[in-house]
UniProtKB/Swiss-Prot annotation:
Entry keyword annotation includes Nucleus: no
Gene3D superfamilies: Adenine nucleotide alpha hydrolases-like domains, HUPs, Translation factors
Gene: mnmA
Any single biological process term in GO: tRNA wobble position uridine thiolation
Protein role: Catalyzes the 2-thiolation of uridine at the wobble position (U34) of tRNA, leading to the formation of s(2)U34.
Amino-acid positions noted as binding ATP in the UniProt annotation, renumbered to this chain: 14-21, 40, 132
Protein species of origin: Rickettsia felis (strain ATCC VR-1525 / URRWXCal2)
Region annotation Interaction with tRNA: where it falls in the sequence: 154-156
Compartments (UniProt record): Cytoplasm
InterPro entries, A to Z: MnmA-like (IPR004506), MnmA-like_C (IPR046885), MnmA-like_central (IPR046884), MnmA-like_central_sf (IPR023382), Rossmann-like_a/b/a_fold (IPR014729)
Taxonomic superkingdom: Bacteria
Annotated site location: Interaction with tRNA: 133, 344
Protein name, per record: tRNA-specific 2-thiouridylase MnmA
Catalytic reaction list: S-sulfanyl-L-cysteinyl-[protein] + uridine(34) in tRNA + AH2 + ATP = 2-thiouridine(34) in tRNA + L-cysteinyl-[protein] + A + AMP + diphosphate + H(+)
Keyword annotations: ATP-binding, Cytoplasm, Disulfide bond, Nucleotide-binding, RNA-binding, Transferase, tRNA processing, tRNA-binding
Length: 365
């Protein structure tokens, strides 16, 4: 059993209503801590009441309250609909309209969950904010370090790369050394009804999985048809709006050709989707921006060999990074990688440790 310090310290738990955060609340309560549960209502409550496989939906708020009542701990629901729309949903929509492939869960952790929940936890006099993420905080020579969860199948470090050093010092991740099965067994041991609740699968504010309808609702008429052009320069047809295409996409292009074609570039300024053979997807280097760095500072002209992940589901790849300025880095793969998508995160690792990361720009070669 993981122990988070002195008995009777106050710890706020970010309770989503799922099995992970519920198990954390129960675990800390059993250890004798003064646990306070907080759940954020992030989007249209009525739309999501029946949605059970998303995060922070109406059913999940009910489940979080039910768990808190069983444990006998205080529980608060904070209305964050306006903040969530402004910081996450609008960003998600605008990213697609800019020809990018957004990552709303990272934006939510950065702009809403960690920033504001930590502020609230401090106001409540809590010593820590605990979450149900599968990552580890390790005390290094220069302070807290962010490490991958021990269970590679559940590791969530890719989604937490924007966590700052200051935030990391205040956060705790009790499940980082556990597997999902172990967490479910803990929840069963505590008698929690959510022990067998399915994991969230979808983007929480896209309850039916149709992100295009969300975009069209928020920015009606913003996505117009345009040209599909082969990377060799000739026109192949017309696309139905750039929001319908992502880098690496092969199906649903609506064009006929004598070899398989993939989306290799999206130009939002001229409203063009470029396609080409699979070989055109191969990338050697690219630029990332809005860097969050958790390790020792990289010197100017220094080249550092690391591992990077450009999608949460892809394994890390060897690469060389170098600092361009305080907000940009160049990432060069040691061997070519396929389908690097602007708008996605590039997270940088040294073994199990997260060194930092940034957002992939259009500067891809």
């Amino acid at each position: 059993m993981i122990n988070l310090g002195d008995k009777q310290s106050t710890i706020v738990v970010a309770m989503s209503g799922g099995v992970d955060s519920s198990a954390v609340a129960a675990m800390l309560h059993e250890q004798g801590h003064n646990v306070i549960g907080i759940t954020l209502q992030l989007y249209d409550h009525g739309m999501a009441v029946g949605k059970k496989n998303a995060c922070c939906a109406g059913q999940d708020i009910y489940d979080a309250k039910m768990v808190a009542n069983k444990l006998g701990i205080p529980h608060y629901v904070l209305d964050y609909e306006s903040k969530f729309k402004e910081s996450v949903i609008d960003n998600f929509v605008d990213s697609y309209l800019q020809g990018e492939t957004p990552l709303p869960c990272v934006q939510c952790n950065k702009s809403v969950k960690f920033r504001d929940l930590i502020k609230t936890a401090r106001e409540l006099g809590a010593a820590q904010l605990a979450t149900g993420h599968y990552v580890r905080k390790v005390n290094g020579d220069n302070g807290a370090e962010l490490h991958t969860g021990l269970d590679p199948a559940k590791d969530q470090s890719y989604f937490l790369f924007t966590t700052t050093k200051e935030q990391l010092e205040y956060l705790s991740f009790p499940l980082g050394g556990l597997t999902k099965d172990e967490t479910r067994r803990l929840a069963s041991k505590f008698g929690l009804e959510v022990a067998d609740k399915p994991d969230s699968q979808d983007i929480c504010f896209v309850p039916d999985g149709n992100y295009k309808s969300v975009i069209n609702k928020i920015r009606p008429g913003a996505s117009e048809s345009g040209k599909i052009i082969h990377v060799n320069g000739f026109e192949l047809g017309e696309h139905s709006g750039i929001i319908n295409y992502t880098i690496g996409q092969r199906r649903g292009l609506g064009i006929a050709y004598n070899e398989p074609l993939y989306v290799v570039k999206i130009d939002p300024k001229d409203n063009i989707v470029y396609v080409g053979p699979e070989s055109a997807l191969h990338v050697q280097e690219f630029i990332i921006k809005n860097i969050n760095w958790l390790a020792d500072e990289i010197k100017d002209n220094e080249k550092l060999e690391v591992e990077v992940k450009i999608r949460s589901t892809r394994p890390p790849r060897l690469a060389e990074i170098s600092k361009l300025d305080d907000d940009k880095m160049k990432v060069k793969f040691l061997s070519e990688e396929k389908a690097v998508a602007p708008g996605q995160a590039c997270v940088i690792y040294a073994g199990e440790r997260v060194l930092g990361g940034g957002w992939i720009t259009r500067d891809i070669r």
